[in-house]
Amino acid sequence: MKKHLITGLFAALALTANAQSFKEWLDPEINAVNRAPMHTNYFAYESADAAMQGKKAQSTNYMTLNGTWKFSWVRNADQRPTDFWKVGFNDRGWNNLQVPAVWELNGYGDPIYVNTGYAWRNQFQNNPPEVPTENNHVGSYRREIIVPADWKGKDIIAHFGSVTSNMYLWVNGRYVGYSEDSKLEAEFDLTPYLKPGQTNLIAFQVFRWCDGTYLEDQDFFRYSGVGRDCYLYARNKKRIQDIRITPDLDEAYKNGSLRVTLDLKGSGNVNLELLDAAGKAVATETAKGSGTILMNVENPHKWTAETPYLYTLRATLQGSNEVIPIKVGFRKIELKGDQILVNGQAVLFKGADRHEIDPDGGYVVSPERMIQDIQVMKKFNINAVRTCHYPDDNLWYDLCDQYGLYVVAEANIESHGMGYREKTLAKRTDYAKAHMERNQRNVQRGFNHPSIIFWSLGNEAGFGPNFEACYRWIKNEDSSRAVQYEQAHGNEFTDIDCPMYADYKHMEKYGQRTDAKKPLIQCEYAHAMGNSQGGFKEYWDLIRKYPNLQGGFIWDFVDQSVRWKGKDEIGRAHV
C-alpha cells in the first residue's frame, strides 16, 4: 500500500500537469487525473451497531447522488458544451435523466450489439488512440445538492460506480479531475471543493468513446452513461485508509490464520475483532499503526461454494467512531501438480460466464436481478462464475461470498477488434500503463473477497509484454490466488491452461499428459447463446475421467436480450 504523502504528491503533480487539457480522452498514458487511489471494498460506519447492520445507504456517512440530473446529449463530440460546468450556466432547457441509467435505453442513441469489432467499425478505421468525433455522443450532467452540515471538518469523497467510457468532473465551477476504465469506480476527494451545509453544483461530462474504448471491445451490447450507484461519503481525517485480509489454513487444513494489513492516514492503534456468524468473538488483536498483524483461529468453519460460512472482521481505530466490517471466509487455494485445490480438495468447476447486463436497464443491474442470477445458478448446480469481461458491481462479489460461488475476477481488458498478433495492444508501450492500471485496480479493490479464487488478466486481447508485466505484478502482490489468461496459451504467464472452445480431442490429449504442470479449465466452452450448447455430456465424461481436467465456464449464462422501445429499420415502433 502506498504512503498517502507520496500519493497526494503524485496526484497534485498530475493535476497541475494535466488540468483540464481536454486531451486526456485521446491519450492512453493519461487514464486518470486527481482520481483517488483504489482501495479494498469496504465502508466505514459511524458505530459498531451500524457496522453490524451493514446498510451503508442508511449511514450518516453516506449521501446518494442517484436520482434526477439535468442532462444534455449531443451526437458528435465537437458539439459538446464547454461551459456547462459554470455555476451561473442556464440549464433550464435541458432534459432530466436518472442516474444511474444508460443513454441508449432512454432515448439518446441506439443500442448496438457487436462481437469482435468496435462500434465505429462502419465509419472509422482503427487507429489507436484516436477515436471518431462523428457519432461520438457526449452527455453532460448537472445537479445541485446540499451536503450535510455536520460533514464539515471531514474528508468528503465522491464515488462514481461505473461510467462509460470516461468522465470529466467539476464541483462548484472548479475542475476536479478525470477518469477512464468504465467498469471500476472512480473516486475523487471533493473536500477542497464542497461547502457543507450549503448548495453545491456537481457537473460531469461523459464521452461515448475515448482512447480507453480500445480496451473495452467486449462481446455484448454497447451502451454509454452511468451504470452503477453514485454517492458521497464522509471520512474522519485520521482513519483507516485501507485494510487487506489474507485468510489461510495450516497444512492439515484444520486451523486458520488471518493476516491483516492496515494502511492508516495518521497514526494510532486499531482494535481488531473477528466475530463468527452468531456475533461471538473468536479472536481479538490490537494493531499498532500501519502494518501487518496475524490473527489465529482454532478450527474455523471453512469457506467453499457448498459451505459459504462467513466471519466478520471488525476494525476500529482507537479514538475514532468509525467502524469497518469485512466479511472473512477461511479457505486455501493451492496449485499442486496439475490440479487446483480448495482446502486440500480438487474441485470440478461447473462454471458460467456472466455479463453484467439487464434487459431493461442495460448496464444498470438491480440487486434483485443479481440475486435472481445467483439463485438460478445455484439451482442448476453452477458453482463458479467468470466476470465477463470486466469487474462487476461490488455487490456481486458480496453475494458470491454469501451464497457460495467461486469467482474468476477479470480485468476490464479486451481489444479483440485489434487482432491478436502484431497489432495487439498487448505489445504497444503507449498502452502498457492502461493494461497495468486496470489489473492493479481490479486486484486492489477485490482483494478481500473469499469467493475470488482466480484473477484473470483480461479477455481476447492478444499477448505481449504488457500482460507479462501484469502477471508478474499480481503474483508479487497476491500469492494466495491463481492467475489466468487464455491468450497466454499455457505459457509461464498463466497458472491455468484456460483455452476457449477446445474440442474433445484436445481435451483428451491434455488429460493423458503425464508432464502437465497446471490444470486445464476452459474459460469458455459449450457456446449456449440461442439454440446451441450441444455435446455437453461428452465434455463432462472427459472431465470426470482425467483429474487434470477441472471443468469450464459455459458461454454464456443468459442471453443478452433487450426490451427496447425503439424503432426498426422502416420506422415501426417495437419492444
Predicted features and spans:
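Hydrophobic h-region of N-terminal signal peptides that target proteins for export
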Residues: 10-18
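Accessory carbohydrate-binding/adhesion or oligomerization-edge regions at the termini
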Residues: 20-119, 201-209, 277, 540, ...
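Accessory beta-strand-rich segments of carbohydrate-active enzymes
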Residues: 24, 55-56, 70-74, 106, ...
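Short hydrophobic beta-strand segments in globular cytosolic domains
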Residues: 176-177, 282, 347
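Extended acidic/polar, glycine-enriched regions
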Residues: 195-197, 263-334
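Surface beta-strand/loop "capping" patches
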Residues: 237-266
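N-terminal carbohydrate-binding accessory modules
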Residues: 244, 314-377
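Substrate-binding/catalytic cleft of secreted carbohydrate-active enzymes
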Residues: 374-377, 384-571
